[in-house]
Structure formats: structure tokens, C-alpha cells
Amino acid sequence: MHRFVLVATGGIFGSLARYVLSGVAQKLTTSSFPYGTVLVNLLGSLLFGLVWGILENRITFAPEARLLLLTGFMGSLTTFSTLTYEGMVLLQSHMWLQAALYIVGQTVAGIMLVWFGAGLGRLV
């Protein structure tokens, strides 16, 4: 039960962070393009890599820290389900190029940012 509480606690704060960050980012533009989702997915990828790099290489953390930070917080901060839904909406709107850039761009950039964040975390 303790592990579920850790994941849920991290999830509460991660989802609140996603809601605030994506809302602020979306309000800064008049475009209907989902910039808020892009921001949280890319920032989340960078932070995931950073935390992972720190947890794996620099600081000895209990396995519970991984559950709280990576599974709970980071899992609810990033929004793959939202990415796929908004990608589908772009496709249904016949916005082929935007959909491709949205989906492929975030996926490639996310992988690169996890790698960069992990490297950065190893240096900390």
C-alpha cells in the first residue's frame, strides 16, 4: 500500500504542475496549436532524464524515491495520452504537416532531452 501512496502523491503534484504549465503556455499564444502539451512533454522529458541521471549515478536513493519522482510525478507531468489525442485531432482536421511535426517532433526531441538530462544528472 505504501508504494501506491508514493505514486499517487507524486501523481497529484505532477498533474497539478502539468495543468498550470500547459495552461500558462497556452495562454501566451493565440494559436490553437497545443503548445502547452509540447512544453510539458519536452520539459518533462528533460526533467525525467535529469532525475534519472541523478538517481542512478550520483545519489543513493531508496527505490521509493523512484516511485514518487519518476513514476508518480514525472508520469503525470508528461502527457502522452494528450499528445496522441491532439495528434489525432490535427489529423482529423487534415493538418497533415502539423500533425507529423507535432508527433514526430516531440518524440524525437523528448528522446534527445531524456538523454541530455541523464547526462546532466550524471554531472551533478
UniProtKB/Swiss-Prot annotation:
Alphabetic keyword roster: Cell inner membrane, Cell membrane, Ion channel, Ion transport, Membrane, Metal-binding, Sodium, Transmembrane, Transmembrane helix, Transport
Catalytic activity: fluoride(in) = fluoride(out)
GO terms classed as biological process: cellular detoxification of fluoride
A GO cellular component annotation in the UniProt record: plasma membrane
Entry-linked InterPro entries: FluC
Keyword Transcription listed: no
GO molecular function, one term: metal ion binding
Primary localization class, coarse: membrane
Pfam families: CRCB
Membrane topology value: Multi-pass membrane protein
Chain segments annotated as transmembrane: 4-24, 35-55, 67-87, 100-120
Residues binding Na(+): 75, 78
Domain of life: Bacteria
Subcellular location: Cell inner membrane
Regulation of catalytic or functional activity: Na(+) is not transported, but it plays an essential structural role and its presence is essential for fluoride channel function.
Family, similarity comment: Belongs to the fluoride channel Fluc/FEX (TC 1.A.43) family.
Its job: Fluoride-specific ion channel. Important for reducing fluoride concentration in the cell, thus reducing its toxicity.
Protein name stated in the entry: Fluoride-specific ion channel FluC
